[in-house]
Amino acid sequence: MVPITYYLLLAAALFCMGMFGVLVRRNALVVFMSVELMLNAANLTFVAFARMRGDNLGHVSAFFVIAVAAAEAAIGLAIVIAVFRSRGSILLEDLRTMKH
């Protein structure tokens, strides 16, 4: 049986990689992927604690986070496509101004 510490260390590493991607990258798609990585790290933490406690609450929470992440990805991708069609770029520094 794998100790919970390993799961939590993996979740922390995934979350840090996602945070690094959000803070450093300039491409909107990479930022969305980094946010998804951070949400998956939270899911791993929920499931690890649920396994440790022996209940299903963490699994239910992870399921809802997955549903919210899917909606966020769909809406975010639609916004990125709309911005790319209107401006021709998806770099975040080009999106700082709201002027067309």
UniProtKB/Swiss-Prot annotation:
It catalyses: a quinone + NADH + 5 H(+)(in) = a quinol + NAD(+) + 4 H(+)(out). GO terms for cellular component: NADH dehydrogenase complex; plasma membrane. GO terms for biological process: ATP synthesis coupled electron transport. Its EC number is 7.1.1.-. InterPro entries: NADH_UbQ_OxRdtase_chain4L/K, NUOK/Mnh_C1-like. Coiled coil: none annotated. It is a multi-pass membrane protein. It is found in: Cell inner membrane. Keywords: Cell inner membrane, Cell membrane, Membrane, NAD, Quinone, Translocase, Transmembrane, Transmembrane helix, Transport, Ubiquinone. It is an enzyme of class 7 (translocase). One of its GO terms (molecular function) is NADH:ubiquinone reductase (non-electrogenic) activity. The chain crosses the membrane at residues 4-24, 29-49, 63-83. The keyword Zinc-finger does not apply. NDH-1 shuttles electrons from NADH, via FMN and iron-sulfur (Fe-S) centers, to quinones in the respiratory chain. The immediate electron acceptor for the enzyme in this species is believed to be ubiquinone. Couples the redox reaction to proton translocation (for every two electrons transferred, four hydrogen ions are translocated across the cytoplasmic membrane), and thus conserves the redox energy in a proton gradient. HAMAP family: NDH1_NuoK (MF_01456). NDH-1 is composed of 14 different subunits. Subunits NuoA, H, J, K, L, M, N constitute the membrane sector of the complex. Belongs to the complex I subunit 4L family. This is NADH-quinone oxidoreductase subunit K. It comes from Myxococcus xanthus (strain DK1622).
